């Protein structure tokens, strides 16, 4: 199947109200202030892909590469670990009756309290890795649920961080519900990146963590003198990352915010279908996609509160487009610099490339020779064996 695009009829120009209850500037700045102090923090690269821009018939393509984030391979390193830190901070505060700094948790000052906490989450791979890292860094137990389609390599990477990994049959959405049930045990807490069930506070912390990536990208563009992008193509999934990008850009720039296009696999299109229906709606496909990190059938309710009026366009792409983008990025002659991107990592770029080739899509998305497009390379080769199978060595 070819790509599909739909315009969100509920989209509102400017800065719609209600964003602050989900992703606020105050929360974003708190996350940026905290995460930037962590050992291993470094601003990830922003690459200017001039050959890709030329091939797409636009002015610039900027690729924010999250493969090196905290050594965990994806932007998710910013969300789950931060949410674990914030949750433990609240638990210690409840016991001591005073606010404690996250740096105290990292030093192990309150290990007698935190070691009694078990955090649990479901994952397609990357979020669970971040939650497991946060548990290791800040001193609690971690249980991660993976579904049938999560590769052994991704599950092993989570176990290597000290988490207990439980493999279930069924889909990602089934594992989300199972994690919510487990979290009802005494001493257990859910750290989810979707709010279909469970602790909204942790889900909000996850999205605030993601804004660190967005703020870095805007700062890098400002320093490069290229200015604000005209468009941002973001990955879909349950919507958490897309909502963080949407809210942060709309709050900063209002009616001058970039046009946002959310990109999903054609067989895992819950956000696309929700935009058509005007309400959270299940994906129509069977969720079988090479883009494992985007294999989600149900929308995050919290994320949808931002996206339902904040994002103008939603699109779906076939697996073939994602693999083509991986191969293009790996070929320095075609991309301008060699970049290693996982199956979901280049999905935003894949959406841009597909749309740029179609005159009707270009017109609908207002893509032209003056367009400056930002995309997020959300993951590196988090399953190296699969990457090598999909991207032939050159």
Predicted regions and their residues:
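PLP-dependent amino-acid enzyme catalytic core
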Residues: 1-394
